[in-house]
Amino acid sequence: TGSTTEGNVYVLAMGNYNDISAKVQKIDNMNVVTDVTEATLMTVKDNTLYLINAPYGATANTYFSIDTKTGNETKNLIDQPVDSPCGIAVNPFTGNIYISSYNMVGGWPSYTTDGYVNEYSANGKFTNKYNVGVGPCGLTFLLK
């Protein structure tokens, strides 16, 4: 979940991997729930949702952002996709985007080998790759 400066709460509902797709829903300050978009991973910085839609079995994943004030969507959020995304975070100080991934083994995500995190500039240009441990699905930043 994440919240924006206008006080809305955004919820990532994962669906059932069958006939109900994962989606983002908004709870506004009047407690009204509305569907926003399909996505499987989400983070928020200021009034921007950073989203990945990587449903099970998909042949391609989408990386995009939505300005929560205007509703405008930015497609192709990053210039170099990861193999099998499992986490996303945005540095609250720099705006850099971090996406974690499983490595692929035999054409499938490996849940037993080390994964990695790609770092992108705030405008989505790949800057660095970090090899990390197994299942790197959670990323966060500590505020001082």
Indicate where each model-derived feature is located:
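Solenoidal tandem-repeat scaffolds enriched in leucines and small polar residues
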Residues: 1-28
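Repeated scaffold domains used in trafficking and secretory/extracellular systems
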Residues: 1-3, 36-47, 82-90, 132-144
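Residue position within the beta-strands of beta-propeller blades
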Residues: 10-12, 50-52, 99-100
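A short loop-to-beta-strand structural motif that recurs across blades of beta-propeller domains
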Residues: 22-25, 62-64, 115-118
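C-terminal closing repeat unit and adjoining cap/tail of repeat-based domains
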Residues: 86-144
